[in-house]
Structures are given as C-alpha cells and as structure tokens.
Amino acid sequence: MDDEDVEIDLLTKSSNVDVFCEASTSGNVAQCATVSELRNGMDFESKEAAYYFYREYARSVGFGITIKASRRSKRSGKFIDVKIACSRFGTKREKATAINPRSCPKTGCKAGLHMKRKEDEKWVIYNFVKEHNHEICPDDFYVSVRGKNKPAGALAIKKGLQLALEEEDLKLLLEHFMEMQDKQPGFFYAVDFDSDKRVRNVFWLDAKAKHDYCSFSDVVLFDTFYVRNGYRIPFAPFIGVSHHRQYVLLGCALIGEVSESTYSWLFRTWLKAVGGQAPGVMITDQDKLLSDIVVEVFPDVRHIFCLWSVLSKISEMLNPFVSQDDGFMESFGNCVASSWTDEHFERRWSNMIGKFELNENEWVQLLFRDRKKWVPHYFHGICLAGLSGPERSGSIASHFDKYMNSEATFKDFFELYMKFLQYRCDVEAKDDLEYQSKQPTLRSSLAFEKQLSLIYTDAAFKKFQAEVPGVVSCQLQKEREDGTTAIFRIEDFEERQNFFVALNNELLDACCSCHLFEYQGFLCKHAILVLQSADVSRVPSQYILKRWSKKGNNKEDKNDKCATIDNRMARFDDLCRRFVKLGVVASLSDEACKTALKLLEETVKHCVSMDNSSKFPSEPDKLMTGGSIGLENEGVLDCASKVSKKKKIQKKRKVYCGPEDATNRSEELRQETEQVSSRAPTFENCYIPQANMEEPELGSRATTLGVYYSTQQTNQGFPSISSIQNGYYGHPPTIQAMGNLHSIHERMSQYETQPSMQGAFQGQTGFRGSAIRGCYDIEETLHDMTMGSSQFQGSDSSHPSDHRLSN
C-alpha cells in the first residue's frame, strides 16, 4: 500500500465548519433536518464538514462515534481517506491473568462512515453502514464526545477561553489585573471578545516587561508550544533574553481560539502595549498562519522559524515516506548544517529530495520556499540569543517549561506564574549585585577575554569564556584566498570534526560553519583562532553586542530626551516608565531603596509647591496607562469589589538586600514552587518542575493519550454583554460580566516527538553543525565557495546599529 495509516483528531481542526443542526427547545436531543439524506455518494466541501454532519447524525440517533483511522497521500502528504466508527466498534482484549475482568461496552459494531477525497478536493461518502448490533443508548454520544457521562442538556457550546477556564478562573484573572493596576500604573491588559460577547483571548503586560522590552527587543520569541501541544491552560508568552542570559517575559496571552483573527489581534495589541516599537527579529513556530500574520503586522521585521519546530514536524509530515533507518535524517542534517553558499544548499537539497522521492511533497516545497527563515546559512548578520536551536529542551525558551503542567488547573498555573515572576526578579537582583561587586577571573592571556570581561555581564562573559580553552584544541589551515576573503579549515580535535571560517579582512567579518554567533550571540573558538591568526588584537565591534553588556538594561529610547509633552496622559505614562527604571536600580540594596524613597518624597513636595493647582484630582481625567482605550458604555464596568467581595489579607513579606539574602530568597522560592507544583495533577507525561532553573534537563515529553475534562454549566453572575465591542483594552476597574460561560469542551493533549538527527545536530543550543565525521565534503565545499562579500549574503542584517557596542 502506498499510504500509511495515521490516527488523527479532527475535533481540534474544525472550528470554522458550520454545524448543520440546532438544539431542540427541550434540550434533550438535537434535531437535524438533513440527517435523513445521509447516503453513499454525498459530497462535502471538506472532511471537517463531513465529520460534523455525521456527528450530528449520531447525536440525533443516539450513539457515540470515534475516528477509527485515516490515510495520507504519499505524493502530497494530504489526507485522502477517513474512517469514522461507532464508539462500540472492536472488542475487548481479555488477559488470561485477569481475576475479575471488567465489563466492556465494545460489541464489535460495524456501523460507521468511510469517506474519501476526490480529485476536485471535495470529500465523498464512500461507504455508509447504518445498522448497529446493539441497543441505542443516547448517553453513548456524550460519553464519546466529552469523556464523561453528561446529560444531553449539558452539551451547550463553549468557545474561546471558556473551553479552558472556569468562571472562577476568569474572576481570579481579572482581580489580578485590577490589583496589578493599583501597584503598577504602567500595567496593560486587553480582552478579546467574539461576536457573541464571550471572552476569546486575553493579553497582559506588566511595567517591568515594558522596561525590559526597551532593552531586549532585538530578538523576541512568540512561543505557542503550550497551545500547540494541548496544555489545559493555553499560555502563549512573548519571550526575550536579558543581558544576564535570563528568560524574560515581554508579554503574556491566553489563547482560546487559534485563528487568523486571534493572532492579528494579539500581535497588534502587543505592538500597541510596547509603544509601537516592533522587534528586530521575531521567532515563531513553522506555521503558515503565523507567518502570514507576522508579515502583515510586522512588515519590516526579520521572521525566523524555530529550528526545533521544523525538526519536530519531520516525523509528522514525512513519516509515511521516509524512515530513520534509510539515512534521510543524516542527509537532512548535513544539508542544513554544513551548506555554505546558496548554490551549495540548493544543490544538496535537490539531491536529497530526489533521492527520497520528495520532489512533489507540498510540505517539503514549503520548507524550501521559506529556507531563509530556518536554514542557518541565511542567518548571517543576526543573533537569536539562545532562543532557537535543534532542541527546545536545551534552549532558554524552555526555562518556563519547569513551571508548566499539561493538566494543571488555572489556579495552579497562576500560583506558579507568580512564583516565577518573583524568582526571576530575585535572580536578576542577585546577578546585578554580583557583576557590580566582583570582577571575573581570567583563564588565559587572550586579549579578547580581558576586553570582554570589562564589558559583559558575568553570565554573558562566562558563555564567551567557555570558548577560550577550546582554541588550543583547534588547528588552522588556509584553504584558499580571493581578494579580501579567505577560507580557513579548522580541525577541531575536541569535537572531532572540521569547521570552516570565512574571514573578510577589510570588515574583519568571520563567519563560521558552527553558527554559534548566529544562535547564541558569542564568537566561537574557531572564529577566535582565525582572528588571532590575522593579528586582530581586539574583538571587532560587530561581535560585541550591547544586549550582553553591563548596561544592557539601561537603554535610552528616543522619548527619554525630555521633549515637552502637552497631554497629561502621555506625561503620566512617561513618568511611570521612568519610575520603573528607578525601581529596578533602587531595589538592588536597602540603602539605595531608602535614598530613592527619600528623594521621591522631596520631589513630590517640590512639585506640589510649584503649582498649587497641581493637586491630585479625585475625579476627572481618569488615568489609563499603556495606551489603552475605554468603552463607550461605562455602565458595563464597575469597581473591583463587585467582582469579588472577599477580604484580601496582606501577608508580611521579608526584605532581601544583599547577595546572600537574594540567594536565600531564590532557594525559598524554589521550595515554594515545588510545593505548589506538587498539588497539581501528576501524570507520567507531565514535564515535572526541576529545582535547578539554570540548567534545563535534556528530557522530552512523552507522547500521551487524549485527556478529557469538562466543566459544570453555570451562568450565575455572568450575564451576556450586548454593549461591549469585540476588543477591550483594560484599564477601567473591572468587567462586571464576561459573557455566557457555559458548556463543555474536549481537549486532546498531543506532544510532538522530535526525530533523532542521528548526530547531525549535536543537541546543542550553540548549534555546532554536523557532528558526523566526514560529513563535510571539502572538495565540493571549496569548489562551490564564491569569494567576496556576496558569498555570505543569506539575508540583510536585522540588527539596528544601536544594538551593537563599539570598542
């Protein structure tokens, strides 16, 4: 057979399909005007439409359904055949050792639907079996669809975040927003509603994230890992990397619906929240929908696909056509990791897809079309700061994975999220104190090492310093030279393979095939050796990134040079932004904190005395931050006390000042995190939080079975909203009503298993290229190399000049 059976879940891919049935007034059964027409030969526009039609037929008759099997075309990779069966198909497998065998509803029922895709892309009912071999039981339908024995009246439609969050969860989230606005005037949040005035998506950004974005917006990762893999809480953060090489949140979202409108709303809202300044590089998963929206919202931003996202899809998209035993992964790794020029990559790619007969595979064609977004050769001139690489588990982006549990409730998620924020704050304060109070120890007499020790933070310098000892284990040989460009072969005895470095003598531009600078932002040992051989005594300015410097978080933006601001709202926002910077610096020690508070009190008195009319107003001129917009109907919104009348008890907190205190605080937070995490449901497939935050465990998530859950129907306290528009940017105190929160939803927790690269990618976030000896065809490589600056022009540099730190 040319095709391979692959189990699929169409329930998660049919959000845009019209349902042909409506619930009856009694709420007991759904009435379908068209189910009587179900017959062989019927056409449907898509497999989702056919599935929904048959599902409503099953609801009206009273039996459960399940997707039994499906097949993809070997040529195109598209689905061509789907079988849907009665939930009582098959028989139970009895074990000989069973003492008290349980009863099983399986009866070997043959009822079902077999559909196939036609040449015109439509789907036809190939075979419909109507008769069942068991008594019809209406509850079977609800058991099969929802995983629990729910009555028919409970099966109302849920949409958006209501599928993931309970009413109490939304209340908790909104209370948090209100509390944060009291504490941080710069806090920003927005709520997205659907056409039925139900919450669809939520976004928020705190004041510290705004400050961090000003310094670390050169590269941002939009992480949809938890959404794509079916986590119960659909958390989608915007991630950056600090000058201490620490994970920082630059915005957070809960995505209730994966659609073009959702991503468009989210990206535009995020851009508004950060002041309209687009990032230098945006990293996302390899996804056509995301790619289209990034181009639309950020037309001038360099868009990059996560390498692990591409690799993780190979088994899914190419499994029917290639196997790990036929050498495909080795060929793929060599093609991606060791190609130097455009021509070299294109020829290797052509040979590879020809060998494995993938010339007409649509996904492979899409990969080649988007090659500049994921192939390392085209990354010359940009830095991904450790946010991408062959494996997610070894990247900075995986740091929050320790705080996530695929089946954690919102309450558990929220507690861990708050612990994470506090932990990161303490770690940053500790790191700031360390680099201010001590100088790093040098390991060699290398001038580069001494130079960067005075510029970089301790964490960034250690990453560069780790390359220094490896220089002595490398042997350099010049292969050829043409004009201003020379090609060197580096024999790395430590890693037991060869690397190539191209050096432009005029620009002092050293491009290495290990791609450490592109992926991590630090010169590799191979480039250091080549620069030394060229008598370069100082690190070239283009390889010293301001984002790693000790002043990396003190970036002054264009608005900092005090221009006259006539609008009171703008003045308020500007002051809040500056106070956040003051808070970051003053919180490092008790003495600095007391000094800042004293000066603030004096400044307030001085401002009041300057103009007696500048009293703090009790009414008008409502101060709203973050560039938010209000609602026309303010009657919909009320004070936060209407959301919850529970008393909030303020707990005493310890004050931590010195480095030792910060370290102790970090340890306490780790222990508290483990305690909170232990209360979450425990499954074999869960990614369990680890104590050590800085060294991610190179573990992966095991493939899991479908996990079902449901919520109770309840509408109390949340009437429908008729006057709220689809998007709400939050600054008014609260939302009194959030729409109809009801119904039940099915979530399947699917974990992608990343295929083994068989050594082609070493599992390093530094990305050393191919680890297979002999994988570099030296003769072929040197023959293909074209001299001159055009040789490495895979893409234009996305780094603005102010992101570099000159000597």
Swiss-Prot record:
Coiled coil: 660-680
SWIM-type ZnF: 499-535
Membrane keyword on record: no
Tissue note: Expressed in hypocotyls, rosette and cauline leaves, inflorescences stems, flowers and siliques.
Localization, UniProt: Nucleus
Predominant location category: nucleus
Summary of the function given for this chain in its UniProt record: Putative transcription activator involved in regulating light control of development.
Name of this protein: Protein FAR1-RELATED SEQUENCE 2
Taxonomic lineage from the root: Eukaryota, Viridiplantae, Streptophyta, Embryophyta, Tracheophyta
Recorded name of the encoding gene: FRS2
